[in-house]
């Protein structure tokens, strides 16, 4: 397998695992995952609002997840670890699921979108963007965006400091897609800089030279021009 095909295969497998965990752990407030390869296997960290539901009674559910990750999705020696989300309002995936759930329960899309924006910003986020796409009010599909604060849309910062969450709401008119982007508090923005004040500034150098003396010396060193009398 070429290196390009390997990258594509790893990306497809990660998306499949993400969809599987999102479906199985919806009641637990699934907030994303992280996969890291180690010398002894693969470390899979699951972030959830309710870790107890992920673990299950006597660890039954987490053992089932480990078996499925190994046999169905081909992850080598998976070691599943569950971590609780410190602040669910700052987790993009959890907020996307909450927004989709509110839309399914009949909330007006503007009220639901602004409510998510307000919760995220009140929790200290630097920026938040909510995108709702689908048949919102009529037969024609459209896209509605809600933005507040600082959001980066392109470049490396959009991948490193912006957290993204995706969810779908199933309604009678069709499926509504939901996307939530959050810039968490404490993120280092690309245009942010600090000016450090030196504790002891260096003293200014005083040059002991006389400009006029140097100029006179240069004139004295130059030969005098010879004038030829015209006949």
Curated annotation (Swiss-Prot):
Family affiliation: Belongs to the universal ribosomal protein uS3 family.
Pfam families assigned: KH_2, Ribosomal_S3_C
Keyword Repeat tagged: no
Residue ranges of domain KH type-2 in the record: 17-86
Quaternary organization: Part of the 30S ribosomal subunit.
PROSITE patterns documented for this protein: KH_TYPE_2 (PS50823)
General function of this protein: Binds the lower part of the 30S subunit head.
UniProt-listed GO biological process terms: translation
Molecular function terms from GO: rRNA binding; structural constituent of ribosome
UniProt xrefs under Gene3D superfamilies: 3.30.300.20, Ribosomal protein S3, C-terminal domain
Lineage: Archaea, Methanobacteriati, Methanobacteriota, Stenosarchaea group, Methanomicrobia
Key words of the record: Ribonucleoprotein, Ribosomal protein, RNA-binding, rRNA-binding
Source species, domain of life: Archaea
HAMAP family, per database record: Ribosomal_uS3_A
Listed name of the protein: Small ribosomal subunit protein uS3
């Amino acid at each position: 397998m070429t290196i390009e095909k390997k990258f594509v295969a790893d990306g497809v497998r990660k998306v499949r695992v993400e969809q599987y965990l999102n479906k199985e752990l919806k009641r637990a407030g699934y907030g994303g995952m992280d996969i890291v390869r180690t010398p002894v296997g693969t470390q899979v960290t699951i972030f959830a609002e309710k870790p107890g539901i992920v673990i299950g009674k006597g660890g039954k559910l987490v053992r089932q997840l480990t078996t499925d990750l190994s046999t169905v999705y081909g992850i080598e020696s998976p070691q599943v670890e569950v971590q609780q989300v410190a602040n669910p309002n700052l987790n993009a995936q959890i907020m996307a699921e909450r927004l989709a759930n509110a839309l399914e329960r009949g909330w007006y899309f503007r009220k639901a979108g602004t409510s998510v924006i307000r919760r995220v910003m009140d929790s200290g986020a630097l920026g938040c963007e909510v995108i709702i796409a689908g048949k919102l009010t009529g037969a024609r599909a459209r896209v509605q965006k809600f933005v507040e604060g600082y959001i980066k849309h392109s470049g490396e910062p959009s991948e490193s400091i912006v957290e993204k969450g995706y969810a779908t709401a199933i309604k009678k008119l069709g499926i509504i897609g939901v996307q939530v982007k959050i810039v968490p508090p404490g993120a280092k923005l690309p245009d942010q800089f600090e000016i450090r004040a030196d504790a002891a500034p260096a003293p200014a150098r005083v040059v002991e030279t006389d400009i006029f003396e140097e100029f006179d010396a240069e004139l004295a060193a130059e030969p005098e021009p010879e004038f030829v009398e015209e006949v």
